[in-house]
Amino acid sequence: MADAPNQKWAGDISYVWTREGWIYLAVILDLHSRRVIGWAVSNRMKRDLAIRALKMAIAFRQPPNGCIHHTDRGSQYCSHDYQKLLRQHGFKISMSGKGNCYDNAAVETFFKTIKAELIWRYPWETRRKAEMAIFEYINGFYNPRRKHSALGWKSPVAFERKVA
C-alpha cells in the first residue's frame, strides 16, 4: 500500500447492467486510505471515461510529482491521451503484468464491495438511476462511513484525518 496520501494511486474500470444497457464505472483510489478520489460513469468504455476519472482525482488531490499511478494494460490506460495526462502531472506510471488481476487488488476489492453492497441488490431501471446511486454510495457512504479492517476499522476519510 502507501505510507501517506498521494504516494500511490490505482485505477480500473468495471461495468453495471441496467435495463437500458451497460454503464461503465472508472475509479481512481488512493492506496493509502482506499479512498475513491476520482470516478466517472459512461455508457461507453472509451478513453474519455478513464480520463474524466483521472482529471477528477487530479483536481481533488493535486498530487506531487512522483506519485505512482497503477492500472492494468487496458486500451483506455495505454492511450496516448491518458499517458500524456499522466506525464503532464509528473506521475510515475505503473501497469500490471499481462493478465495479472492481482496486481490491482485494491481496486478489484472496491468493485467487489460496491457490487455486493449496492449494484447486485437492485434491478436498475435506468442508467441515470444507477449513476446517482453510485454517486451516493461513494460520496455518502463508502468514503466517509464504510469501515475497513485494513484501516483499523476506520473509513477512508477518517483514516486520512488521523494521518493529517
What is the predicted function of each stretch?
Residues M1-A164:
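Charged DNA-binding/catalytic regions of mobile-element recombinases
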